[in-house]
Amino acid sequence: MIDKYLDRVVQQLDEKVGRLQEAVGGGAAKDFSEYQKMCGEVQGLLTARLYITDLRKALENSDE
């Protein structure tokens, strides 16, 4: 049951990362500081995604 919620969160993270990557690649950052902020946001979202993936694996292993 929790899998569908975790899947939805991962999907939302992936969508946000994709939008940020497109923005960075498209030159949306006005200056280097904004570029760094956007890259940091991508890094943070990917870290959160990794934590969720690890949590899912731990939950699957606890069921066994």
Language-model-detected regions and their locations in the chain:
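Short intrinsically disordered terminal tails
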Residues: 1, 57-64
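Short, charge-rich amphipathic interface segments used for partner binding and complex assembly
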Residues: 29-60
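N-terminal acidic leader/helix
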Residues: 1-27
